[in-house]
């Protein structure tokens, strides 16, 4: 069959967007999505995002298959791309959507300057909600030791609807993420695997981060990871509640509100091209 698609990216974190509004189930299997994400034999992407009908009073539902065929709960850069995709389909420039995801209802807002601001919800900090066994149920994981690749890392864990393990380092550019990333992702302390963020503090309001994403590997940006980065910086006394997070693909503005405990992410989403692919 011929699949119509559009390609979008958020700071280089790129996705295949599919208009799936006529069905409540994705029109592709995880295996087909994995084939399309292949950068040599397919379209090439970090994941496939499906725009499905809304549930429970929401405007739309988002489902995602990663480049390895796995399905994450949510994706911060992905939901910005989805919001831009929906706005392009509807022919509007400024709009707020309520999107049902496996991590709950997320609210992206298209701004007049072309940026997308997203209410990412509240972070979950208790060990069983990450989930991880690094601390007993009911306790937080903040700067606790984790042995990986022959050394001990001080890690903080945050769930943004998906699991994040975060560690602060002196120089993020010196790390071999291809080598150590999978060891964090598949560490037995994380029953559902984990995303891993390596963070360098540039200032109290500026953080530099590289990410190894669960199911996707090294990516140029991670929205939920940027949110978790600011949470970890605040919890460990390394950063402010409002920070610029520098990623290989560009910057995200993150605020962890003291008023409502919610995280707000602002960043770009851009259409690259549209086409058809044979499945």
UniProtKB/Swiss-Prot annotation:
Catalyzes the stereoinversion of LL-2,6-diaminopimelate (L,L-DAP) to meso-diaminopimelate (meso-DAP), a precursor of L-lysine and an essential component of the bacterial peptidoglycan. The record marks 164, 213 as: Could be important to modulate the pK values of the two catalytic cysteine residues. HAMAP family: DAP_epimerase. Its main location: cytoplasm. It catalyses: (2S,6S)-2,6-diaminopimelate = meso-2,6-diaminopimelate. Transmembrane segments: none annotated. Pathway: Amino-acid biosynthesis; L-lysine biosynthesis via DAP pathway; DL-2,6-diaminopimelate from LL-2,6-diaminopimelate: step 1/1. The gene is dapF. Keywords: Amino-acid biosynthesis, Cytoplasm, Isomerase, Lysine biosynthesis. It comes from the Bacteria. The keyword Cytoplasm applies. This is Diaminopimelate epimerase. It is found in: Cytoplasm.
């Amino acid at each position: 069959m011929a699949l119509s698609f559009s390609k979008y990216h958020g700071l280089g974190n790129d996705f295949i967007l599919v208009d799936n509004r006529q069905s409540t189930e994705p029109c592709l299997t995880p295996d087909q999505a994995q084939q399309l994400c292949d950068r040599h034999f397919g379209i090439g992407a970090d994941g496939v995002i499906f725009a499905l009908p809304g549930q429970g009073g929401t405007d739309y539902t988002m489902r995602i298959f990663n480049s390895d065929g796995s399905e994450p709960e949510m994706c911060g850069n992905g939901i910005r791309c989805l919001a831009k995709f929906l706005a392009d389909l509807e022919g509007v420039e400024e709009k707020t959507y309520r999107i049902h995801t496996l991590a709950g209802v997320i609210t992206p807002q298209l701004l007049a300057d072309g940026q997308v601001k997203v209410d990412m919800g509240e972070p979950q900090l208790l060990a069983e909600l990450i989930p991880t066994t690094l601390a007993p149920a009911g306790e937080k994981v903040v700067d606790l030791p984790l042995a990986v690749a022959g050394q001990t890392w001080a890690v903080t864990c945050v769930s943004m609807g998906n699991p994040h393990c975060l560690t602060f380092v002196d120089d993020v550019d010196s790390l071999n993420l291809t080598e150590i990333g999978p060891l964090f992702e598949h560490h037995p302390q994380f029953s559902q695997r984990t995303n891993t963020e390596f963070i360098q503090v540039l200032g109290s309001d500026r953080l530099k981060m590289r990410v190894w994403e669960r199911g996707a590997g090294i990516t140029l940006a991670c929205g939920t990871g940027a949110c978790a980065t600011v949470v970890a910086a605040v919890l460990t006394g390394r950063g402010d509640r409002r920070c610029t997070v520098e990623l290989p693909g560009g910057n995200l503005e993150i605020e962890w509100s003291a008023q409502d405990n919610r995280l707000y992410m602002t960043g770009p989403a851009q259409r690259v091209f549209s086409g058809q692919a044979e499945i």
